[in-house]
Amino acid sequence: MATMARSFLQAISKDEAVAPPLRVVQIEGLAVLKIIKHCKEFSPTLVTGQLLGLDVGSVLEVTNCFPFPVRDDDEEIEADGANYQLEMMRCLREVNVDNNTVGWYQSTVLGSYQTVELIETFMNYQENIKRCVCIIYDPSKADLGVLALKALKLSDSFMELYRGGNFTGEKLREKNFSWMDIFEEIPIKVSNSALVSAFMTELETDTPVSQGDYDRLHSSTTPFLENNMEFLIKCMDDLSMEQQKFQYYYRNLSRQQAQQQAWLQKRRTENMARKSAGEEPLPEEDPSNPIFKAIPEPSRLESFLITNQVSNFCGQINGVAGQNFSRLYLTKALHDN
């Protein structure tokens, strides 16, 4: 019996050590509606909420969620946030709702979610939850007939770098790490129970074409394109400022290296004279000399995040432009006929 128990425990520990990678986030339709309702009601204010569910193998099931209250005072948020979450967990437990935290959701404006604050929140969740996700919802895309819902997690390689706090160019080249390796997008699968699916089938009308289908044919997306261009220009300015920081760093580094070479040449000449006089040579390095003090290299994390945002805005502009061209060609063909 003891041998069987020991084998069982070894099998459990082995399964826990070799956890399958996360392949899909399965979210209930009710949770999706709650997220959309919360983000839409407070738009353009950014809001967040807690995700509840189960971690089953390679699938992360999100069965429910609840919103976090919106407060202006950061100190008030810190004081009341923990108590609010505990009270909500207790209430959900009493009504037999899954109360296991699997991550959080948050709204965004035009997909500009790649920030240091998001990474810090991820790392805080990672202390207690090994596999947590963040579901991002963009209410601004709802007017275009798009359900802008995506699930994100931090890559393992990025978390290793972040814990080490080393985002220098040498370290990034050693790890072969680029700005595209920060986030991993997990596919989302929306699921409903059989009763809900049957009920939705009953509610579905027999009309083959709805007003939403006509709305998707509208080519007027001027505000969306303008906002994307405005955000893109701002990101390019921020990226230019980051590049100026690195240019300033490399100028100082080159100046320091030139000063070090001049100092070493002078010291070697002095040592040759001392040897000729029969005196002990002086050390060629002087740690007390300011020119030998290492200049700290700026972190590349901020520039990587800004590059992520630039790529996101370019992708959105490209997508909307492509859709509008398709609509224009369709309209032209109908007009010609």
Swiss-Prot record:
Q: Which GO terms describe its molecular function?
A: metallopeptidase activity; mRNA binding; translation initiation factor activity
- The organism named in the record is Arabidopsis thaliana
Post-translation changes: In response to auxin (NAA), phosphorylated at Ser-178 by ATPK1 and binds to polysomes via TOR signaling. This phosphorylation is repressed by Torin-1.
The function of this protein is: Component of the eukaryotic translation initiation factor 3 (eIF-3) complex, which is involved in protein synthesis of a specialized repertoire of mRNAs and, together with other initiation factors, stimulates binding of mRNA and methionyl-tRNAi to the 40S ribosome. The eIF-3 complex specifically targets and initiates translation of a subset of mRNAs involved in cell proliferation (Potential). Regulates translation initiation of specific 5' mRNAs harboring multiple upstream open reading frames (uORFs) in their 5' leader sequence (e.g. BETA-OHASE 2 and LHY).
Summarize what gene deletion causes.
Pleiotropic growth defects throughout development including postembryonic growth retardation, and delayed shoot and root growth, flowering, and senescence. Lethal at 80 percent at the vegetative rosettes stage. Reduced fertility. Compromised translation efficiency of specific 5' mRNA leader sequences. Requires exogenous sugar to transit from seedling to vegetative development, but hypersensitive to elevated levels of exogenous sugars (e.g. sucrose, maltose and glucose). Enhanced sensitivity to abscisic acid (ABA). Impaired uORF-RNAs polysomal association.
Q: What biological process terms from GO does the record include? A: abscisic acid-activated signaling pathway; formation of cytoplasmic translation initiation complex; positive regulation of translational initiation; response to abscisic acid; response to auxin; response to glucose; response to maltose; response to sucrose
The name of this protein is: Eukaryotic translation initiation factor 3 subunit H
Similarity comment: Belongs to the eIF-3 subunit H family.
Please list the residue ranges annotated as the MPN domain: 25-158
- State how it assembles: Component of the eukaryotic translation initiation factor 3 (eIF-3) complex. Interacts directly with TIF3A1, TIF3B1, TIF3C1, TIF3E1 and TIF3F1. Associates with the CSN (COP9 signalosome) complex. Binds to CSN1, CSN7 and CSN8. Interacts with ATPK1.
Localization, UniProt: Cytoplasm
Entry's InterPro entries?
eIF3h, eIF3h_C, JAMM/MPN+_dom, JAMM_MPN+_peptidase_M67A, MPN
